Amino acid sequence: MKKQKVTSQKQKITYRVNEQIRVPEVRIIFQDGTQKVMQTAEARRMAEERNTDLIEVQPNAEPPVCKFDNLGKLLFKMAQRDKDLKKKQKTTTLKELRFHPNTDKHDFDFKTAHLEEFLRKGNRVRATIVFLGRSIIYKDKGLELAERLTERLSVVGNRDGDPKFEGKKLFVYFEPDKKKIDAYDRIRTKTGKLAPLPDEPEEDGENND
């Protein structure tokens, strides 16, 4: 049996369409979310009347699940989605800024403003809290700073896991959250708070993820 094939990012997806669907009945999922089990021949007739294709999307269901859609447009959307995903994966960068347990308010505000901006641009960020000399005995201060960072950056991102100690460094990772970023940008635009950031600190680091 001839099948229409398309390769997605993770797996090969094979669709049966129109006359390729040989089962006696199918479950149709309509665009409004309603469902109906009907004879396959009737479903094909409906597809023709709608000038669209009958596409089997869940062949292992009982009965198989189909929908009415334009196969060419569906495959194009999937190819475009995979292309966008690949592009996003290639351009995602890990941005890093360093702090100390006793980082003062000015330095904290300055650096977290940059971390916010990195997240707004879709980058992952890492805040590295460095314990110099014997300051490692003040781990609690480092963890408190990590919580302050988490609260400050929660408007545009989410913390990725718990803070992790490695030697005399405490690493805190954050992921951008598109919904939060969109909402945050709307508020900033409305209130006119889109002032340019100062130059980045010299100790900034940048690594490819």
From Swiss-Prot:
GO biological process, one term: ribosome disassembly
MF terms (GO), sorted A to Z: ribosome binding; translation initiation factor activity
Domain of life: Bacteria
Assigned keywords, A-Z: Cytoplasm, Initiation factor, Protein biosynthesis
Coiled-coil residues: none
Location of the protein in the cell: Cytoplasm
Disulfide pairings: none
Gene3D superfamilies in the record: Translation initiation factor 3 (IF-3), C-terminal domain, Translation initiation factor 3 (IF-3), N-terminal domain
Entry-linked InterPro entries: T_IF-3_C_sf, T_IF-3_N_sf, Translation_initiation_fac_3, Translation_initiation_fac_3_C, Translation_initiation_fac_3_N
Pfam families for this protein: IF3_C, IF3_N
GO CC term, one of those recorded: membrane
SUPFAM superfamilies attached to this UniProt entry: Translation initiation factor IF3, C-terminal domain (SSF55200), Translation initiation factor IF3, N-terminal domain (SSF54364)
Transcription regulation among keywords: no
Predominant location category: cytoplasm
Family membership: Belongs to the IF-3 family.
Complex formation: Monomer.
Job description of the protein: IF-3 binds to the 30S ribosomal subunit and shifts the equilibrium between 70S ribosomes and their 50S and 30S subunits in favor of the free subunits, thus enhancing the availability of 30S subunits on which protein synthesis initiation begins.
Name this protein carries in UniProt: Translation initiation factor IF-3
Lineage: Bacteria, Pseudomonadati, Chlorobiota, Chlorobiia, Chlorobiales
